[in-house]
Amino acid sequence: MGGIRNPFLFRATEQNNEDDLFIQLFSEDILNILKNEITEIFVKPLILRSSPGFGKTSLLKLFTAQILRKLISYQSAHSDKNDLLKAVKSLNFIDEENKIRKVGLYIPCTNLYSNIEDVIEDEKGKNILFFALLNSRIIFEFIQTLKFILKEQNKNFNEELVEISIEDISKLPLNLKENYEKNYLSLKDFYNYAISVEKEILKYIDNFGLVDYDNSIKLSNLELYSFNLLSNSNIKYQGKNFSLDFVIMFDDLHKLTTLQRDLIYKTILNDRYNISIWITERLSILRDNSIFHGTTNNRDYINIHLEDAIRGKTNKKIFSNFLSNITKYRMNFGSNNIASFESKLSTIFEAQDIEDAIRHLQKELNIYSESIKYKQLIEEINNFCEYNFGTLLKILAISIYIERNRLNKQQTFDFVEIEKSETEESLSTLKPSAEYFSMIKCKLAYYYSFEKITRLASYNTEQFLSIASKLYEEMIARSIINKEEPLSPDLQEKIIEEYANNKWNEIATNIINGREIQTFLSKLLKYSYKESIRVNAPYVPGVTGFGITSSELKKLQDDKYYIKLKEILMSCISYNLLTIDEDRKQGSKKSETVTIFYFNRWLCVKYKLPLGYGGWKRKRISDLNDSIKQDELTKQFEILQ
């Protein structure tokens, strides 16, 4: 295909149907998350959770037959994707002879399933219809996958379908078993049965339950019999074991009703099927997870919080490297003469702005020049002769250090001089706060550079692409009029601030209870700003979230008094306004675990907060509940509207 005007606007890979482009834009770095669990993810249910926009759907679709076959065909023509092929091979989906050995059966959890609960009142009837439809969809996807693979092997689908049989039919619905006297069924029998079941259920839903459905469905077992059918040992081809392993992949499980979601989890965790099962769903700390009681993560299932995994405990650059690769792949498809995205983002300030800021700080800090204690520090500040950003950060760090020392109740006497060597370690730890204070005290740009944009993404690929697309538009505009210089820090920040303001305005129009959510977040963000700009920078680099203890979270779950707060928090998580860092401890090992709710980084832009993690304040549920209360003026304004 031809070049794309703005490759960052070519939205999330799950939305495009071009296999070539899907592969070209896919970054293999994300597969390391699965590789770390390679011994478990095919023998235990795998649950992948994240905020919306992470790329869960794209991850699952990579392992479908069509994409795997296309990836294999790339090995000679597209050497730049050999790393992706190697990564997929390391997960055993493709062998060293480039044959598909495992394949994903992609099952999206659409609204069709939840519609079942709208047309039938009986709970058992709901469950039977739900499982009947789910089984038919799984079988249909299985056969469509086989059809594609057989076609690729130049085999006749209809002829081969009769040759593939299911040996053990003991778990089948009674009515299906009774239709056949032979001790096995061909896939053609299952194919016809699956189609007939789906037609009956769709007719029932389309007629709002006013017509009856086939009695054979009513006699169905309340089981996911398709799981048993598709185990490798149960499928025979011309009497021999089948050469493919299947991974059933449920995408967006959160779109099901609570009853349906719980039913799937209970069935999978209790029945221990002999087939690989992967599930993706949105992260929600406030969902009732009692269905997992009696089971243990890593023993009965594998639960991966994707943001946690890519955040990197030992390598903090995992996510930024991941985004750097995505950027490189996207830039290859641009139709403009912009060679490098990162090089078009300047990190250099106007020399005069830096010099003015340094001279202003030197003058401001001279009030401590008469103090013996700070003599060496002030002399160092006044002796700086290089007017650059590094010098400015050193002066700001010294300024913060002096304020900390002044406010410390256990400070040394004023006549005891602080040695320069005593301050060096402290000053190095204050660099993030110094950089933040360059915006607060010196009015310099803070939200700029590729490194900052990766942090603004909040570990969310979709968000990164949105921000990058805005900056790229400016690059295009400048290239048209032959302006070759990169975007200045000020211009980058202006574009990013416009993005944040637009996102903020969308809350009121795009989310139910949007104004209440804005009120709730606004109060917390203003409080965080007030804490972050304290002259002694007690939280490095600032406060960008709040923490709730496990006992307080239990109140939120159990006490109906807080139902409104619970709804607002769940909306904030669902719409990626808050991200979660679970089960953290503060203090001793015996202390209560804390769940930290971090503001999405674009909210930090809106309220002039730093972009670091780690700075948060503990909040009681009662305090948070007060934050959702609007003042009378706001209420009257909404009534007038």
Model-found features: residue ranges?
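C-terminal leucine-rich, beta-strand-based interaction scaffolds used for sensing/assembly
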Residues: 109-110, 373-641
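N-terminal pre-Walker A segment at the start of P-loop NTPase domains
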Residues: 1-37
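Phosphate-binding P-loop
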Residues: 35-43, 241
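P-loop NTPase nucleotide-binding core
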Residues: 61-234, 297-400, 405
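Conserved P-loop NTPase "ATPase switch" module shared by AAA+ and STAND
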Residues: 237-258
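Conserved lysine of the Walker
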Residues: 56
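Sensor-1/coupling segment of RecA-like P-loop NTPase cores
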Residues: 255, 269-295
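Walker A (P-loop) phosphate-binding loop of P-loop NTPases
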Residues: 53
